[in-house]
């Protein structure tokens, strides 16, 4: 019985790139290779406009499951490779059609003749291939407008690809082509989604989390580690910086009027994150802010908070409502982790009436009464850094180390 031997990957947005296209293709190939480490028999060939993954006996469903999370892939097809002879093409088309799962009642044939010297024209091939499928199946009809299955045939010199099963990729651009950002990862619903959407634009992320023991628990810290771990499904690794924030928060609570404590806290977070960004050669800061969602996310608040950093602040969720954000969180697997009931540092010192229209002048005047620089230095110096990779990759590396 014929089985799928190849997966053909289409790039999508990457095809609009000019001189940098080879870099994008190379990065995507590297990311796919990393994602498919578990499958040693696979061979990957990336051309200018498509990627060919030769399965060599590996499970196509298991490989497909991992491919769907790789940014830079628009769509991919499970494919069979047959000699460019009419009888072989007919047999391959039938075999591919029979492997399609689900309630299939209609189909159509699409033929692309890359090899123009093939002895039959497209309009001659359609009834030959379609007729062979009809002769060898029951209760199946042709529907050229809205078929359940599109049997695609690509004819080349010497061989042809037969494809039925088309699947959607993650879209976007390959992670790594767009530089690096620091993302503020709170442990809530929004910030992991912001990290995901940033990666979708080809940007590598490192996460910064502020925790305030004993006011925040080890479980709250573990929750953030688990979120960062979940995000590794979409990239090679996530570096997580855990910043001790207790002394900064206690000082803000003591020295700053309560209405401005939230604003000043966010400004301190920006200052610390900027320092880490400089150390790590990051080019921007990403946050999970959504306009008007809470008091610290008004335009006035953002204007006042932005003052303390020269780095671009990327806010992927800025115009989304909460339901839109939750939907993405559920799709990417972070929602159930985010709703674990453990407080983060943003909630333990929440003022009763935070200013919704804070002014830069006031924030600067309040901050000038106390020298926060030593506390910022201490927080940066005492941060804990860990590098997280997908569980499977870690398991493979541990297995390799056990051999020595």
Curated annotation (Swiss-Prot):
GO terms for biological process: thiamine biosynthetic process; thiamine diphosphate biosynthetic process; thiazole biosynthetic process; tRNA 4-thiouridine biosynthesis. Residues 61-166 form the THUMP domain. It is an enzyme of class 2 (transferase). The keyword Methyltransferase does not apply. Gene3D superfamilies: 3.30.2130.30, HUPs. Catalyzes the ATP-dependent transfer of a sulfur to tRNA to produce 4-thiouridine in position 8 of tRNAs, which functions as a near-UV photosensor. Also catalyzes the transfer of sulfur to the sulfur carrier protein ThiS, forming ThiS-thiocarboxylate. This is a step in the synthesis of thiazole, in the thiamine biosynthesis pathway. The sulfur is donated as persulfide by IscS. This is Probable tRNA sulfurtransferase. It comes from Bacillus cereus (strain ZK / E33L). The gene is thiI.
């Amino acid at each position: 019985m014929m089985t799928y031997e190849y997966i053909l990957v289409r790039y999508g947005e990457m095809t609009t790139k000019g001189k940098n296209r080879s870099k994008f293709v190379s990065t995507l190939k590297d990311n796919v290779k990393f994602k498919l480490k578990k499958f040693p028999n696979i061979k990957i060939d990336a051309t200018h406009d498509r990627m060919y993954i030769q399965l060599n006996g590996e499970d196509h469903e298991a490989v497909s499951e991992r491919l769907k999370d790789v940014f830079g892939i628009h769509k991919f097809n499970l494919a069979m490779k047959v000699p460019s002879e009419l009888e072989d093409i007919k047999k391959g088309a039938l075999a591919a059609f029979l492997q399609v799962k689900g309630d299939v009642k209609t189909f159509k044939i699409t033929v692309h003749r890359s090899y123009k010297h093939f002895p039959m024209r497209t309009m001659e091939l359609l009834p030959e291939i379609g007729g062979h499928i009809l002769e060898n199946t029951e209760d199946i009809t042709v529907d050229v407008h809205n078929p359940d299955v599109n049997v695609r045939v690509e004819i080349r010199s010497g061989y042809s690809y037969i494809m039925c099963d088309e699947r959607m990729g993650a879209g976007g651009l390959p992670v790594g082509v767009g530089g690096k950002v620091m993302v503020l990862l709170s442990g809530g619903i929004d910030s992991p989604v912001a990290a995901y959407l940033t990666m979708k634009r080809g940007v590598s992320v490192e996460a910064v989390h502020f925790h305030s023991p004993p006011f925040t628990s080890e479980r709250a810290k573990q929750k953030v580690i688990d979120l960062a771990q979940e995000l590794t499904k979409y990239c090679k690794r996530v570096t997580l910086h855990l910043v001790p924030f207790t002394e900064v928060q206690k000082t803000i609570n003591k020295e700053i009027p309560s209405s401005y404590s939230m604003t000043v806290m966010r400004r301190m977070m920006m200052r610390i994150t900027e320092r880490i960004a400089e150390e790590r050669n990051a080019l921007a800061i990403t946050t999970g802010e959504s306009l008007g969602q809470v008091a610290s996310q008004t335009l006035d608040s953002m204007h006042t908070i932005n003052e303390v950093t020269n780095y671009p602040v990327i806010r992927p969720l800025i115009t989304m409502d909460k339901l839109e954000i939750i939907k993405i969180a559920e799709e990417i697997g972070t929602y159930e982790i985010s709703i674990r009931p453990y407080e983060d540092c943003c909630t333990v010192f929440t003022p009763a009436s935070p200013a919704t229209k804070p002014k830069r002048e006031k924030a600067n005047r309040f901050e000038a009464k106390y020298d926060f620089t030593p506390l910022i230095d201490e927080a940066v110096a005492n941060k804990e850094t860990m590098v997280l990779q997908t569980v499977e990759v870690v398991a493979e590396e541990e297995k390799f180390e056990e051999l020595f």
